[in-house]
C-alpha cells in the first residue's frame, strides 16, 4: 500500500478541482525539497505541509542558496509560514499561504439527552494516542466510549513495517480498555462515510501540526471537538473546539482531557451547543471547502503564470 496521508489526500483534491491544463504548467513538490528533480520547463512550487523542524527538510532550508531553486513556496497555514520565515528566512516575496480543505460535509446528526456519546480518534498514534488512552482510564461513565482508528499504515506498508512496533503497546492498551474499541486502520473514505456516527473528536495532540485534515473533517461534519492549542491547531480549529492547554506533563493532559470529556455529557444536548455545532459546520463549508480552495489555487497559479510570461 502506498502512503495516503493528509498530504496525498490534498494532492488528489487539487488535481480533482483545479484545471489540469493549468496545473500542467507547474511542477508541485510536496514538503521535502527536491524529492522530485526540479523541472527545467515548468514553474517549480514547493507545497509545504511539514513542520519546519523535520529532519528530512531542515538541512536543505538551512542552506540559503537552496531557497532560489523554487519559484514559489506555498504553506498550508500562517503558523507554518511564520515558522519557516523566522527560522530559515525564506524569501517572503515568493511565499504564499493556501490552507488545506475538504470536500466531505455530511448531514449533521443532532445529539439528544441520554444518547450514547461515541468518540473517534483517527490521527496517527504519535499524535497523542497515549494521552487520550490515559484519559479514558479515568472516565467511568459507561455512556462514553472511544473508537480508535490510529495506525502507521496510513503512510504505507514500508513505513508501517519500520515503525509500527513502537506503537503496538498502545494498540494493545486500547484493545484492553472496556470503554475503548481498537478498530485499526480504515481508509479515509470509510472514516468520512461514518464520521457522523460519532459526537466528539477528542484530539489530545502533542505533535506540532502545521494544519490538520482530521480536525477539518471532524469540524466540517459538525462533531464537537476537544483539542490542544499546540502547533497550528488553534489556527485550523479557530474558536470552535474546547481547548485543553498543551502541557509537557502528559499525565496532567490526560487528566484535563478526562475532565473535559466528562463535562460534555452535561451540555452536548443543549440547544445552544447544537446551534454552535451547526454554525461550526457552516463555517467550514464556507471557508474550508475545495469549491473555495480551488478558486484560491486557480487565482494564484494564473497570477504566477501571467507574471512569468
Predicted features and spans:
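N-terminal pre-catalytic "stem/leader" segment of glycosyltransferase-like enzymes
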Residues: 1-38
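A charged, aromatic-enriched C-terminal amphipathic alpha-helix characteristic of glycosyltransferases
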Residues: 5-9, 248-251, 255, 269-306
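Active-site proximal beta-strand in glycosyltransferases
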Residues: 26-56, 71-75, 96-98
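Donor nucleotide-sugar binding/catalytic pocket of nucleotide-sugar-dependent glycosyltransferases
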Residues: 71-85, 90-107
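Conserved donor-binding/catalytic core segment of Leloir-type glycosyltransferases
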Residues: 111-128, 133-136, 146-147
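Nucleotide-activated donor-binding/catalytic signature segment of Leloir-type glycosyltransferases, i.e.
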Residues: 160-186
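Short hydrophobic beta-strand element within catalytic cores of glycosyltransferases
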Residues: 224-227
